[in-house]
């Protein structure tokens, strides 16, 4: 009797899942898996002395395609990294004199990034300031001097200036979140006008001397009016603009996806159909931003939320869902950070494990994508691929805790990994069942996890 009831239950779940469209047909191909697993910054330099604490091998293993710099100095306390004011600390000095630059820490950081196998996007700007007063983020009044400093930084890394390198760093962005006074402080409140003039002053000499580079901005905090006005400024003055990015800290993958579509549409309307669209910073968002800085009691709970299973499955869902979007680049903020990062001690937390799972799906961009749907209204996101004679399926149960049944066509499952509150992308042997006749795979959900993600490895028929 119990056996009959169990089979009926499986049949019911299967019928429901097929009605939901949880079918993976490995014969249906859709190009390649796009490597949208970019990140902000790289393995921390301030704990690299000892092999046991060095994050570099983990970052290398994650196969990150591109790492863009923002808040690198904050991620590495005590190190003068990346920011303009840390490379060229005394603004009144001669910008043509190599002795006035401090390149060595940033040199090591850039080389460290490249050692992971990742490209670099170098942000010419400053780290955010949460202090009462503003110091490094005050808008310079001499834009030409600022541009002179920036072109020398580019020359150092791409043309060997000042005992530098020829690294061919392609991507150069200007500033970050210029619509916020915490990162671009304009005493007159004219952030848009100031940023536009700053951007133009910096990128014109870069593109003139290094035409193969890509330049872009504004990396705003979701202010479409600011973004559109900036793009219109570039159009009206014929200012180079190769990519446009913004920041997003939603708790819903569809909100992020809609913002990407809106930005693509805006660029096409304004006159930049070839400009790339990207998200400069993204992460499962906090429920209250002020709690992180002003409420120690709530900050601990907020940090746990940002590193927990809902956040991890959100990350996996974003990487899956944005395959069907105009996004060219996504950058997760920020794996090496303590609050926002990939790590629980020396081990990967759910966010880091989501990126590890995606790495297995993508195979450095060589994996063929299988055409599967997602069901955001039900909190279910699917991604499937095949490479090396194997098939892979990633199923995300975002904020739902029920079982799932997949119908697989052209493949037989051989192992199932699960990410949940307890299981850290580990193989589960007793929580799945394969019925070869109809080709159904039952995936048992964990008992006490608000979200879960499965990674299924298959042999292709």
Where are these regions (language model features)?
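Substrate-binding cleft and catalytic face of glycoside hydrolase catalytic domains
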Residues: 62-251
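Carbohydrate-binding surface patches
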Residues: 375-412, 417-422, 448-456, 460-461
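Alpha-helical scaffolding within the catalytic cores
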Residues: 22-27, 50-55, 103-108, 155-160, ...
């Amino acid at each position: 009797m119990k056996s009959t009831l169990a089979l009926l239950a499986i049949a019911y779940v299967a019928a429901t899942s097929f009605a939901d469209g949880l079918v993976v047909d490995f014969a249906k191909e859709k190009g390649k898996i796009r490597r949208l697993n970019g990140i902000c910054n790289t393995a921390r330099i301030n704990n690299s002395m000892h092999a046991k604490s060095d994050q570099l091998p983990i970052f290398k293993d994650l196969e990150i395609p591109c790492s863009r710099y923002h808040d690198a100095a904050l991620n590495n306390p005590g190190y003068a990294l990346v920011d303009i004011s840390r490379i060229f600390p005394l603004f009144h000095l001669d910008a043509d004199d190599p002795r006035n630059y401090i390149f060595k820490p940033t040199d090591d950081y850039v080389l460290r990034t490249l050692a992971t196998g990742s490209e670099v996007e170098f942000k010419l700007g400053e780290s955010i300031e949460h202090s009462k007063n503003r110091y490094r983020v005050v808008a310079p009044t001499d834009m030409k001097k600022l541009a002179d400093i920036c072109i020398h930084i580019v020359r150092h890394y791409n043309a060997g200036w000042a005992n530098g390198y020829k690294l061919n760093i392609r991507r150069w962005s200007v500033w970050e979140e210029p619509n916020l006074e915490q990162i671009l402080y304009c005493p007159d409140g004219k952030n848009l006008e100031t940023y536009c003039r700053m951007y133009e002053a910096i990128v014109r000499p870069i593109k003139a001397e290094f035409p193969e580079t890509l330049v872009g901005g504004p990396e705003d905090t979701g202010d479409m009016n600011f973004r559109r006005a900036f793009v219109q400024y570039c159009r009206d003055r014929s200012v180079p603009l190769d990519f446009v990015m913004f920041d997003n800290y939603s708790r819903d993958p569809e909100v992020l996806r809609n913002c990407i579509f809106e930005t693509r549409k805006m660029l096409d309307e304004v006159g930049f159909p070839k400009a790339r669209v990207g998200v400069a910073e993204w992460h499962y968002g906090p429920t209250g931003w002020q709690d992180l800085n002003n409420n120690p009691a709530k900050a601990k709970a907020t940090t746990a939320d940002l590193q927990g299973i809902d956040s991890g499955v959100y990350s996996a869902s974003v990487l899956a869902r944005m395959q069907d979007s105009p996004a060219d680049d996504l950058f997760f903020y920020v794996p090496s950070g303590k609050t926002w990062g990939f790590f629980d001690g020396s081990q990967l937390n759910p966010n880091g494990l989501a990126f590890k799972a995606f790495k297995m799906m993508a195979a450095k961009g060589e994996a063929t994508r299988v055409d599967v749907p997602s069901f955001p209204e039900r909190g279910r996101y699917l991604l499937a691929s095949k490479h090396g004679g194997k098939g892979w399926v990633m199923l995300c149960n975002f904020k739902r805790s029920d079982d799932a049944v997949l119908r697989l066509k052209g493949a037989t499952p051989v192992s199932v990994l699960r990410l949940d509150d307890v299981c850290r992308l580990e193989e589960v042997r007793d929580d799945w069942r394969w019925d070869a006749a109809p080709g159904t795979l039952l995936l048992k959900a964990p008992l006490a996890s608000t979200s879960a993600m499965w990674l299924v490895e298959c042999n292709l028929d």
